[in-house]
Amino acid sequence: MGKILTSEEVAQSLEGLESWAIVEGQLIKAFKFGDYLEGIAFAGRCGKIAEEMNHHPDLLIQWRKVTVSISTHSAGGLTALDFEFADKIEG
């Protein structure tokens, strides 16, 4: 479990992430794809990273779109681990 970030730390961490937002205490981004199977492949990649980090997001899989939502439940808010996960799936 990590330390909950302050609002200033959250704002600073968001600067390095394109199109991510904070919604109801979650770090969220919707990723768009050319077809459904591309989205499924992306979700699989997210799952692999989540297992490696032992930090698991919520994934909403829709036609040509996957929405990723993450926070550190054990800490009760956003931590550096959430932003590290976001950075890894962007890479």
Whereabouts are the PLM-identified features?
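C-terminal structural segments of small proteins and small subunits
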Residues: K65-G91
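Helix N-cap motif at beta-to-alpha junctions
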Residues: D35-Y36, A75
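N-terminal first-folded block
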Residues: M1-G34
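Amphipathic, hydrophobic secondary-structure cores in small proteins
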Residues: H56-K65
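Solvent-exposed alpha-helix faces
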Residues: G44-R45, D87
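Solvent-exposed, charged/polar functional surfaces in cytosolic regulatory/catalytic domains
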Residues: G16, I49, K88
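Short arginine-rich
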Residues: S19-I22, R45-P57
